[in-house]
Each structure stands twice: as C-alpha cells, then as structure tokens.
C-alpha cells in the first residue's frame, strides 16, 4: 500500500497540556537543590531539634508561591529527598532521609491545599510550614521506632523535640511568606508571568 492511501485527518487531536511547564519543573528542581544546599551550608549552632526547618520551610513556602500549583512542594520534597539520599545525607540511612524530605513537601502541600493555597499570607504560611516540618518529625520518630535506632531527639524528650519542630517550622513559614511578599513588591511575578 502506498503512503497516499492512508487518510489524513483535517482535525488533529489537541495536544494534551502538561500540568507543570518545563520552566516550572526547572524552578522546582532548583528549589529542591536549594533545600539540600541549605541543609549542608546553613547550620545554626543551636543544638536544638528541628532548627534547620527555619531554612527548609522558607524555601518550601517560596516554592509554593513561585509555582502556585498543587503538588509543587511535594515535587520539591521528592526531588530534594532523592538528591539528599544520593549524597548520603541524614543520620539514619537513605530511606529515612528520602521519606523525611518527601514528607516535608507532601505535608506542606496538604496544609496549603486545606488552607486555601495562599503562601504569601503570614498565618497560612506559618501553619502550612509548621505542619510540613512536623511531618518530618513524625517520619524520623516513626522510622526510629520501627528500626529500633537510637533517635537523638528522644533523649532530649519527645515534647521538647515536637516543640522545636513546630516553632522552627512556623518561623521558616513566616520567613518564606515575607520573602514572597518582597518578591511581589519587586515585580518578580510579573517578570515570571512573561517566562511561562
């Protein structure tokens, strides 16, 4: 049969639009890398459980504002978890590291979904970040219980560790919301709209 004998449709099926654009995926990958870099480079000499959440959660909230779609922070969490596990970060192995980072993103996404997806709002950002960071605590505690590994924050007391994760998560959320507000004032989002 010759090529000419196959009928060609006049109406091509419309291309299915992807949920995240390539540009948005690149931004989310950069935020994921920034989470890992922040964990390595930005260390506070506080010796308190959960204190790194002030940086993590700020980055997660900014990611949720820059790519305002459900699943954005989950993707940042999964990607940063893969990077961190590959680099051998974390105290209790690759699985614990991957799940911890992933649950930060998933918990933040879930909280933002329930609270109305307004990460630039100080209260919403603080609550969402607090919940996301508390999910990390739950993973670490749960994995410690399941594996019987000595979990450092258990020695400090479970209540103190929980308070640390909640407080530093909320502070990170406030920092992220303030960063988003500054980006709005600077005109970053009108610039970003041109790039989509």
Q: Can you say where each PLM-predicted feature lies in the sequence?
A:
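Residue-level signature of transmembrane alpha-helical entry/exit and packing/kink sites
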Residues: 20-31, 53-57, 73, 97, ...
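Membrane-helix interface "capping/anchor" motifs
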Residues: 63-76, 114-122
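Aromatic-anchored segments of alpha-helical transmembrane domains
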Residues: 32-41, 79-87, 129-139
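Membrane-embedded alpha-helical hairpins and interfacial helices in multi-pass inner-membrane proteins
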Residues: 117-196
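Hydrophobic transmembrane alpha-helices
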Residues: 10-66, 71
């Amino acid at each position: 049969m010759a090529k000419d004998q196959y009928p060609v449709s006049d109406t091509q099926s419309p291309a299915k639009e992807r949920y995240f654009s390539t540009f948005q995926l690149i931004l989310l990958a950069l935020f994921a890398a920034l989470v890992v870099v922040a964990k390595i480079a930005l260390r506070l000499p506080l010796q308190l459980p959960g204190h790194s959440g002030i940086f993590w959660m700020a980055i997660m909230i900014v990611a949720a504002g820059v790519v305002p779609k459900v699943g954005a922070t989950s993707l940042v969490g999964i990607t940063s978890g893969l990077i961190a596990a590959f680099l051998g970060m974390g105290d209790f192995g690759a699985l614990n590291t991957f799940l911890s980072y992933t649950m930060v993103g998933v918990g933040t996404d879930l909280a933002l979904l329930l609270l109305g997806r307004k990460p630039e709002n100080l209260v919403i950002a603080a609550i969402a970040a607090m919940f996301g960071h508390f999910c990390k605590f739950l993973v670490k505690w749960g994995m410690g219980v399941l594996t019987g590994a000595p979990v450092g924050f258990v020695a400090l007391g479970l209540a103190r560790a929980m308070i640390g994760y909640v407080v530093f998560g909320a502070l990170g959320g406030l920092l992220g919301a303030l960063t988003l507000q500054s980006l709005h004032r600077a005109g970053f989002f009108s610039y970003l709209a041109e790039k989509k």
